[in-house]
């Protein structure tokens, strides 16, 4: 009788371990999101994997100034003059090299490119032959609108 109990206990312990193993295997991969932060007199909208150092892009402003710095964390991106597009809007802007291997440019929040980015969630920065695309999926476009409102001075 003891061998049967031992086998039953081993089987039950094995069954209890299986859901944890399945759960560990079915965890979603790191997911890119947009997060809005306000601290120290600035507003930052970051395209990131939460709780990591992984960034694709950030927008940063001082509330009410009507300008934002767009930083791109694309190792292929280069400094120089860029064509920035969103929807049917386009503009030429200077892209500067910045610390940490990123590049950045300044966007006017009343420019048609920013308005089209807020409306459609897609923006492209093309420097020479290289293109960096910034996307805010529909679930994050509310944060993009909120960023624009805070930075333009609307409350």
Describe the role of every protein-language-model region.
Residues 1-8, 17-18:
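Bacterial N-terminal signal peptides that target proteins for export
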Residues 13-21:
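C-terminal segment of classical bacterial N-terminal signal peptides
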Residues 23-78:
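An ectodomain-focused feature that recognizes extracytoplasmic/extracellular
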Residues 32-38, 59-61, 84-86, 93-98, ...:
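Short, exposed beta-strand/loop patches in secreted or surface proteins that constitute
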Residues 73-74, 78-90:
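Extended low-complexity, serine/threonine- and proline-enriched intrinsically disordered segments
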Residues 88-155:
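Internal interaction segment
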């Amino acid at each position: 009788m003891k061998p049967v109990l031992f086998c039953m206990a081993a089987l039950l312990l094995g069954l209890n371990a299986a859901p944890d193993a399945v759960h560990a295997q079915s965890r979603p991969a790191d997911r890119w999101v947009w997060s809005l932060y306000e601290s120290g007199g600035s507003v930052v909208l970051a395209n990131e994997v939460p709780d990591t150092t992984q960034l694709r892009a950030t927008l940063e402003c001082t509330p009410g100034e009507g300008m934002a710095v767009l930083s791109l964390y694309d190792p292929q991106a280069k400094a120089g003059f860029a064509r920035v597009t969103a929807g049917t809007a386009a503009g030429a802007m200077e892209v500067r090299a910045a610390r940490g291997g990123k590049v950045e440019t300044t966007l006017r929040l009343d420019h048609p490119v920013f308005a089209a980015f807020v409306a459609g969630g897609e923006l492209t920065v093309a420097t020479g032959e290289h293109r960096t695309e910034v996307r805010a999926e529909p679930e994050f476009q509310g944060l993009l609108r909120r960023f624009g409102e805070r930075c333009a001075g609307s409350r």
